[in-house]
Design a protein with these regions (language model features):
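Structural signal for interior beta-strand "rungs" in well-ordered beta-sheet cores
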Residues: 71, 76-225, 237
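Terminal amphipathic alpha-helical/low-complexity segments used for targeting or macromolecular assembly
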Residues: 1-75, 204-205, 209-211, 215-256
Length: 256
C-alpha cells in the first residue's frame, strides 16, 4: 500500500468512527500516535489547490478538503457557514449551529451541540451529549504525535467564550462556566478542598468529574505584584454538580 492509499484509507476510517486519534482503554485515555502520523503525512503528500466556491476563494491541500454530508448521516448542520474537515467524525444527532468548524481527526459523539462560532480543533475528542456553547474553542493537538488531544467526556457543559487547550481532559458531567480558559499551565483551585489541581506527569490538566468551574483569580504571592495587590487568572471549582445545576442544564437542552 502506498502512502497516499494509507492516508485515504485512514481518513475514511476516521470519518466512519471506526478509528480514533485517542480512545479510553481500561479507564485511561490513550493516544493512537500512528493515526496522527498518517494525518500529518496528508499535508506532506497533498498539493495546494483551488477550492473556490462561488464568490468565495479558498486554497488548501487537495488531500484535506471539507467533508460532505447527506441527510442519511443524521447530522444537523444548519445553513450559514459551518465547515467540517476531512477526517473528522460527527455522530448521528450532532447539531452544528453556524458558523462553526470541526477540524481533521476530531471525534464528536452523539447528541452533542456545537454552537455558533465554536471550534472543535484537530484531533479533539468530544463525548456524548456535550454542549459546546457559542464562541468556545477546543484547541487542536496534532504535534507531538504522542501527546493526547483535548478530551471532553460525556455530558459536559461548556459555557460561552471558553477555551480548553493543550491536551486538557474534562471529565464526565463537569460544567465549565462562561469565559473559563484552561491550558496545561493553568492551576485550578478547588474551593471545596482548598487545594490546587496542576498538570500531571504527562503535562495535562484534568478537570474532575462533576466539577463546576468558574473564572476567578489568585493573588501574586511575592514581589512588586504582591505589593500592588495584583491578581492572576485562576479557574475555580466552586462546587460539584448537584440537582440544581443539572436542572438548569436540562432546561437549556429543552430550549435547543
Amino acid at each position: 500500500m502506498t502512502d497516499i492509499e494509507k492516508f485515504h484509507d485512514t481518513i475514511a476510517a476516521l470519518e466512519s468512527g471506526k478509528v480514533r486519534v485517542a480512545e479510553k482503554v481500561d479507564g485511561e485515555w490513550k493516544v493512537n500516535s500512528w493515526v496522527k502520523e498518517v494525518i500529518l503525512s496528508g499535508f506532506r503528500l497533498g498539493k495546494l489547490t483551488d477550492m473556490t466556491q462561488g464568490q468565495f476563494s479558498f486554497f488548501d491541500k487537495d488531500t484535506i478538503p471539507t467533508r460532505t454530508f447527506t441527510a442519511e448521516n443524521g447530522v444537523r448542520i444548519v445553513p450559514g457557514g459551518s465547515s467540517v474537515r476531512a477526517g473528522a467524525y460527527l455522530a448521528p444527532s450532532v447539531i452544528m449551529m453556524p458558523p462553526a468548524h470541526v477540524n481533521i481527526g476530531a471525534y464528536v459523539d452523539e447528541g452533542t451541540m456545537i454552537d455558533s462560532h465554536a471550534l472543535v480543533g484537530s484531533c479533539a475528542q468530544v463525548g456524548k451529549h456535550v454542549h459546546l456553547s457559542a464562541a468556545s474553542q477546543l484547541g487542536g493537538v496534532l504535534e507531538p504525535v504522542g501527546a493526547l488531544p483535548v478530551i471532553i467526556e460525556d455530558n459536559v457543559f461548556i459555557g460561552g467564550n471558553c477555551g480548553i487547550y493543550e491536551g486538557t481532559i474534562v471529565k464526565e458531567n463537569a460544567v465549565i462556566g462562561t469565559g473559563v480558559i484552561i491550558n496545561a499551565s493553568t492551576a485550578i483551585f478547588d474551593a471545596t478542598t482548598g487545594e490546587y489541581i496542576r498538570a500531571n506527569e504527562n503535562g495535562q490538566i484534568v478537570v474532575p468529574s462533576g466539577a463546576v468551574v468558574v473564572a476567578g483569580s489568585r493573588p501574586v504571592s511575592k514581589g512588586p505584584g504582591a505589593e500592588q495587590g495584583i491578581h492572576l487568572y485562576c479557574p475555580v471549582i466552586v462546587k460539584y454538580r448537584d440537582e440544581k445545576t443539572s436542572g438548569s442544564i436540562t432546561l437549556e437542552d429543552m430550549l435547543r
